[in-house]
């Protein structure tokens, strides 16, 4: 493999890692929001 190809792969992997991290953070926030809504609904109907 050429050095340039290795660098391109490193950049691609770095971007993928960041995108995965951002996606995980977003999913955690969504999950937290759903949990809060569920608690509110439970309290409201109880």
Curated annotation (Swiss-Prot):
GO terms for biological process: positive regulation of single-species biofilm formation. InterPro entries: DegQ (IPR012554). Belongs to the DegQ family. Stimulates the phosphotransfer from phospho-DegS to DegU. Affects protease and levansucrose production. This is Degradation enzyme regulation protein DegQ. It comes from Bacillus licheniformis (strain ATCC 14580 / DSM 13 / JCM 2505 / CCUG 7422 / NBRC 12200 / NCIMB 9375 / NCTC 10341 / NRRL NRS-1264 / Gibson 46). The lineage of its organism: Bacteria, Bacillati, Bacillota, Bacilli, Bacillales.
């Amino acid at each position: 493999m050429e050095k340039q190809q290795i660098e391109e792969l490193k950049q691609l992997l770095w971007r993928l890692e960041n995108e995965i991290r951002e996606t995980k953070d977003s999913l955690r926030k969504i999950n937290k929001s759903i949990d809060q809504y569920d608690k509110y609904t439970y309290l409201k109907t109880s």
